[in-house]
């Protein structure tokens, strides 16, 4: 079986040069329509290796590539994203469940229009998922990620720094809890901790561990869906804010609260729309957190069924620095004419021509001076921001 994902294209900036993409300093994502500046591909190969009755084994692999789309020949090292085996119905007492081990994209939750994965513990791991409890389905898993350095040891009176320090994440989810007609709840608890080698220790005041709590309500509505999400994280789980842990850091002690409402619906005949509203407050003890607001819509009008449509994406991001009290704001508009394989807003592949306009007001950035004691800390001014010395720009191009 072959599955995959790819995007590529060509674009220009109105003031000259190649297409530049727009992202608000401090925000964790950007509005992506007409605002992607790289060639990226995931090539998935899989095969059912064995089947007997309702029991089976499936091998799944995924290799990803990313280049800057500036030339014909662009070499890159592939990223080995997935290599796992999934066994279904192997445990008689848990019919319908799947036992798995290996590297895997594990039950990822995202907002498509801003390419934001708010619950994603993907990596090497193992687990048992979709255990039917009658009132819902239980999944348990353990995965791993790593950090550069992060721990050290004194060996033969010499300090040795670890090349990498691993973090383990333990995940429990209960999904499919029916709450109302067309609606269901999912709850999750993720515990992440740094796991050092023997004789190695973390830096004083390292966050060491943390938790991420997630509650998500999914509602079928208007020919599509709406998802309402509330998440709370502490300490090591506040760096990436997605479920991965960074327990060696001394800069992420604190907490995070996030609320998201997003979905895709049918407004009327020939009219579909994606939308998102997001609030995220990261409060760190070192006063270097942020408060991020985002709101956007992407309506689509079918011009010629089933292949041609017109899309308009309007998105706004605002990020307040905990340290400086200043705000970075940006709005972005994209108009695109699209030809796609079907009449849904999700239909792919799709080829489009687009024009994008962005306007921003950046008041703070991050100190990026190497070896500075303030490196990585927020500061007033536009140094260390994505403003490029201007306040607005337009781009145009074609992509799929």
Swiss-Prot record:
Disulfide bonds join 21-37. It is found in: Cell outer membrane. Keywords: Cell outer membrane, Disulfide bond, Ion transport, Membrane, Porin, Sugar transport, Transmembrane, Transmembrane beta strand, Transport. It catalyses: beta-maltose(in) = beta-maltose(out). It is a multi-pass membrane protein. The record marks 117 as: Important in sugar transport. Induction: By maltose. One of its GO terms (cellular component) is cell outer membrane. PANTHER family: CRYPTIC OUTER MEMBRANE PORIN BGLH-RELATED. Belongs to the porin LamB (TC 1.B.3) family. This is Maltoporin. It comes from Yersinia enterocolitica.
């Amino acid at each position: 079986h072959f599955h995959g994902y790819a995007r590529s294209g060509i674009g220009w900036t109105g003031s000259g040069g190649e297409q530049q993409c727009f992202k608000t300093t401090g925000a964790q994502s950007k509005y992506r329509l007409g605002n992607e500046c790289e060639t990226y591909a995931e090539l998935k190969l899989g095969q059912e290796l064995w089947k007997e009755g309702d029991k089976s084994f499936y091998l799944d692999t995924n290799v990803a590539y990313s280049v800057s789309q500036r030339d014909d020949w662009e070499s890159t090292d592939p990223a080995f994203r997935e290599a796992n085996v999934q066994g279904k119905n192997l445990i008689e007492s848990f019919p319908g469940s799947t036992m798995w081990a290996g590297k895997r994209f594990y039950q990822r939750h995202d907002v498509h229009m801003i390419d934001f994965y708010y619950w994603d513990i993907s990596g090497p791991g193992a687990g048992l998922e979709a255990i039917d409890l009658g009132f819902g389905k239980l999944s348990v898993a353990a995965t791993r990620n790593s950090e550069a350095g992060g721990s050290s040891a004194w060996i033969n009176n010499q300090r040795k720094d670890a090349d990498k320090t691993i973090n383990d994440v333990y995940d429990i989810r209960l999904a499919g809890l029916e709450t109302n007609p067309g609606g269901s709840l999912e709850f999750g608890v993720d515990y992440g901790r740094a796991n050092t080698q023997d004789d190695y220790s973390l830096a004083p005041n390292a966050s060491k561990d943390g938790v991420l709590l997630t509650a998500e309500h999914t509602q079928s509505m208007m020919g599509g869906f709406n998802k309402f999400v509330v998440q709370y994280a502490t300490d090591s789980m506040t760096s990436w804010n997605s479920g991965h842990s960074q327990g060696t850091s001394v800069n992420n002690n604190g907490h995070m609260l996030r609320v998201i409402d997003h979905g895709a619906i049918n407004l009327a005949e020939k009219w579909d729309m994606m939308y998102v509203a997001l609030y995220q407050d990261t409060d760190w003890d070192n006063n270097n957190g942020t408060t991020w607001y985002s709101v956007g819509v992407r309506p689509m009008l079918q011009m010629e069924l089933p292949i041609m449509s017109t899309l308009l994406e309007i998105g706004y991001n605002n990020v307040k620095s905990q340290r400086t009290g200043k705000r970075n704001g940006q709005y972005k508009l994209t108009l695109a004419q699209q030809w796609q394989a079907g009449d849904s807003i999700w239909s792919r592949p799709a080829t489009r021509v687009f024009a994008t306009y962005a306007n921003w007001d950046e008041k703070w950035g991050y100190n990026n001076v190497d070896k500075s004691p303030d490196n990585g800390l927020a500061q007033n001014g536009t140094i260390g921001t994505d403003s490029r010395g201007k306040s607005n720009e337009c781009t145009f191009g074609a992509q799929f």
